[in-house]
């Protein structure tokens, strides 16, 4: 019994550390990426379709609302807030879903369809935004049905999609760095195709690995719960 309690305490400490790290990284990416879209003379960090006048407005809405989701999302997973301040937990959840994920996913679909990054990022971003919306809807329906276990699982899946915005930047830097030795030979000294390759790989990797990691985590969590119930 003592060993079991100690194991649970260690797991709880690791969980708090992981959530704190996710919160810090999320805030850092918001401070880095979002402000460029909130000034009058927007300096977009991605290509804009000049022939589509509503491309930039949808991109601004997507950046701002996704930033809200990244800022408030991690606080949904602090157990102390859920247990001791349930009203705050519910308010933060509503802000996350209604001011963050809902407008962020819908505007993101439009921005994805108009992307200049190529067909692979286009399809990947559209699928991400559809899943982002769908998982939020499932989480909302679960909590309305008072199925809190399913609500937590769908919220974790949803935030894994949200957090892809953080990992995309990390993987982009990594894929650029590993290709730099190929710049002069394979790419003929042209950095643009190197960046395009790195960006496509980062988009796919950030989304696929985040969602795969979360499914593995949830499956292991359910397995541990089943074993714990048998003990």
Ranges and model annotations:
Residues 1-231:
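Alpha-helical membrane insertion/targeting regions
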